Amino acid sequence: MISPSLLILYVENPAASGRFYEQLFGRAPVAQSPGFVAFRFESGLGLGLWSTGSPEFVSSGTGHRSEIAIVVDDDAAIDALHETWKAAGVAIEQPPFTAVFGRTFVALDPDGHRIRVCPPDK
């Protein structure tokens, strides 16, 4: 069986994006180079930030077509994280609201990738 273990976001400045996610996640990257920064989580999932300026990066796509979802326990945790990120200067695209799947909000990273905070699937 195939099991995804790494998500990659293509970013203009991996070092700046790495600092952003380090603050957001409260953890240091596990790997860094001029064109790539990587984080690893207890679940085994990894997040890679790869430079769009890298000679290995080839894409005919345009725009931001990705969203990271961070699942938290309940509505209070969603609202608390929103306030923490807002106070830290994180760009908020959608303030907390109740969608069909529950309370949620969406923040943006420095490259405009969406970061959704939401409850677990039920």
Positions of PLM-derived features:
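Short alpha-helical
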Residues: 15-16, 76
